[in-house]
Amino acid sequence: MLLHFSKMHGLGNDFMVVDNVTQNLYVNPDQIRRWADRHTGIGFDQMLLVEPPYDPDLDFHYRIFNADGSEVAQCGNGARCFAKFVKAKNLSNKNHLKVSTKAGKMVLHLEKDGQVTVDMGEPLFEPAAVPFKAQKAEQTYVLRVKEETVLCGVLGLGNPHCVIAVDNVDTTPVETLGAALAAHERFPESVNVGFMQKVSADEIKLRVFERGVGETRACGSGACAAAVAGIQQGLLNERVKVSLPGGDLIIRWQQGQPVKMTGPAELVYDGQMVL
């Protein structure tokens, strides 16, 4: 079988994207890990599958696999690439797409300037919904990790997210502290960890450690989670510029409303391989 795929990225968060509407690919974790290897494979943070919809009111089903082969429920940067991919491959001529994911439903909008706006849904704060082990929902929680205490916001946005405010993201030990928090017993399904530095009420700098991946150049859902946590805690305004190592995203959120994320998506190359 000859498999056609595209390599894409959203702010350096890179993906292998596969049309599973006109092709029929069954993937397993070992296969994904081999393809994700940056020395011997294609190399990517996540693999995205475009599948036919399960609901006639939707356009597609969107599946996401981390580089370690695990399937996850959400990827905001991937969602922007998903929207660009289906238009480029003539799978849809719509600029407004409704897709299902493991986490629920998403709305993707292709803007006239080439950027993509993603309706990420409403954030979840109830600990059981994240999931996170706590007696009740709080704006911040105190966690003991690596013999120190950290104050963090915790929420669900397709994936579990933990957001920590820091003085300087450039000197924060993202890999070690992120890995320790991802393995923390209070996160039964692990967690994506965001380290947020406030620049102003309208802008933050952010680095994200993604579960099953490590630190990435950008994390769309992590950017949304950081903005939401900052807004909820009264630190940020309702429109926030999030500066990640790979570039900038614009996040908008009002209490009780879905989170909106706007940013770029780029094609790197189209490829094919024999299975």
UniProtKB/Swiss-Prot annotation:
Subunit relationships: Homodimer.
A molecular function (GO) term: diaminopimelate epimerase activity
Protein name (database record): Diaminopimelate epimerase
Function recorded in the entry: Catalyzes the stereoinversion of LL-2,6-diaminopimelate (L,L-DAP) to meso-diaminopimelate (meso-DAP), a precursor of L-lysine and an essential component of the bacterial peptidoglycan.
Chain residues that bind substrate: 13, 46, 66, 76-77, 159, 192, 210-211, 220-221
Intrachain S-S bonds: none
Site feature (Could be important to modulate the pK values of the two catalytic cysteine residues) residues: 161, 210
Class in the EC hierarchy, top level: isomerase
Location within or outside the cell: Cytoplasm
SUPFAM superfamilies with a match to the protein in the record: Diaminopimelate epimerase-like
Family statement: Belongs to the diaminopimelate epimerase family.
